Amino acid sequence: MKTGMIICLLLIAFMDADGSPGDTLYSQKTADTDSGMKRFQKTFQKRRCVFCPKEPCCDGDQCMTAPGTGPFCG
């Protein structure tokens, strides 16, 4: 009985005012993982360099392409 009451009080303590779970460790970890994946994808795409089609840019004549967009200097 006491264990159930303690669990219930802990759940209430971590809830926001609207009754949804607050900033728990799990939700923060998920957000950090998502931002880490996005950061990794950006750096991976920047390493994939091709020659610029029209004019030289940033590093000599190399520029970067992102899927769905044109070439850009990074």
Swiss-Prot record:
<protein>
    <recommendedName>
        <fullName>Conotoxin Im6.10</fullName>
    </recommendedName>
</protein>
<keyword id="KW-0732">Signal</keyword>
<keyword id="KW-0964">Secreted</keyword>
<keyword id="KW-0800">Toxin</keyword>
<feature type="signal peptide">
    <location>
        <begin position="1"/>
        <end position="19"/>
    </location>
</feature>
<dbReference type="GO" id="GO:0090729">
    <property type="term" value="F:toxin activity"/>
</dbReference>
<keyword id="KW-0165">Cleavage on pair of basic residues</keyword>
<feature type="disulfide bond">
    <location>
        <begin position="57"/>
        <end position="73"/>
    </location>
</feature>
<comment type="function">
    <text>Probable neurotoxin.</text>
</comment>
<keyword id="KW-1015">Disulfide bond</keyword>
<keyword id="KW-0528">Neurotoxin</keyword>
<keyword id="KW-0960">Knottin</keyword>
<feature type="propeptide">
    <location>
        <begin position="20"/>
        <end position="47"/>
    </location>
</feature>
<dbReference type="GO" id="GO:0005576">
    <property type="term" value="C:extracellular region"/>
</dbReference>
<feature type="disulfide bond">
    <location>
        <begin position="49"/>
        <end position="58"/>
    </location>
</feature>
<feature type="disulfide bond">
    <location>
        <begin position="52"/>
        <end position="63"/>
    </location>
</feature>
